[in-house]
Amino acid sequence: MASLWLLSCFSLVGAAFGCGVPAIHPVLSGLSRIVNGEDAVPGSWPWQVSLQDKTGFHFCGGSLISEDWVVTAAHCGVRTSDVVVAGEFDQGSDEENIQVLKIAKVFKNPKFSILTVNNDITLLKLATPARFSQTVSAVCLPSADDDFPAGTLCATTGWGKTKYNANKTPDKLQQAALPLLSNAECKKSWGRRITDVMICAGASGVSSCMGDSGGPLVCQKDGAWTLVGIVSWGSDTCSTSSPGVYARVTKLIPWVQKILAAN
């Protein structure tokens, strides 16, 4: 195996900040030059969170799905000693009104395999709820039968490396627009590693990279941004001609709903 970089909206979200509709609109310059991404508009991806260890090191992304819950990748290995940082754009700034949220419980999908990277999803129950605002709100979850066809133009965001050999990750949240691929097309690059609980995007001059893991791949549905993928793995050089691989959220929704209902 190549050295892989392991990279229904709830009514409780409240009418003021409905899911998937940022108060500050994102501006995506189509298939822009996160490798070959661009700075996001500050606050325009309000569900994007940074997962940080106790030293403040950003190691993965995640997405708010309600005031109490964050979804990320299982391979991120989140612990309750880590924190969720919401409302952040520039990790080099002390001026932002960020929320540093403790994690009460980590629910890793029991079917996750580090060998196949199947079922790469973890849910984080926050110890104290996020306070929704202009820059902090939830992404919509798809239903299990939602269809997001190949060719759909979607967006991914994160503080991951902008070059695979970069010494550090960018301070400012990066974004890129990229098309979904069919699994058949994706298998041309990745072969049998691609399973039905994965979805591919990119190979279009942009790529997710190390540090983006756990973050969102979102597509618009009925005018609201919906979580279609969770950044999972891809080329060890973050090649922009190889598709990035994401956990396919529609296939994982039954497990998500079960955990949310029981907790």
Curated annotation (Swiss-Prot):
Pfam families in alphabetical order: Trypsin
InterPro entries per the UniProt record, alphabetical: Peptidase_S1_PA (IPR009003), Peptidase_S1_PA_chymotrypsin (IPR043504), Peptidase_S1A (IPR001314), Trypsin_dom (IPR001254), TRYPSIN_HIS (IPR018114), TRYPSIN_SER (IPR033116)
User: For this UniProt entry, which segments traverse the membrane?
Assistant: none
Q: Where is it mainly found? A: secreted
What does the record give under GO molecular function?
Answer: serine-type endopeptidase activity
Q: What is its EC number?
A: 3.4.21.1
What are the cysteine partners in each disulfide bond?
C19-C140, C60-C76, C154-C219, C186-C200, C209-C238
Phosphoserine sites (modified residues): S93
Q: Name one GO biological process term.
A: digestion
Which first-to-last residue range defines the signal peptide? 1-18
An example Gene Ontology cellular component term from the record?
extracellular region
Catalysed reactions, semicolon-separated? Preferential cleavage: Tyr-|-Xaa, Trp-|-Xaa, Phe-|-Xaa, Leu-|-Xaa
Query: Active-site positions, per UniProt?
Result: H75, D120, S213
Protein localization: Secreted, Extracellular space
| Keywords recorded for this protein, A-Z | Digestion, Disulfide bond, Hydrolase, Phosphoprotein, Protease, Secreted, Serine protease, Signal, Zymogen
Residues forming the Peptidase S1 domain are 34-261
- Report whether Signal shows up as a keyword of the record: yes
Q: Which family does it belong to?
A: Belongs to the peptidase S1 family.
Descriptive protein name: Chymotrypsinogen B
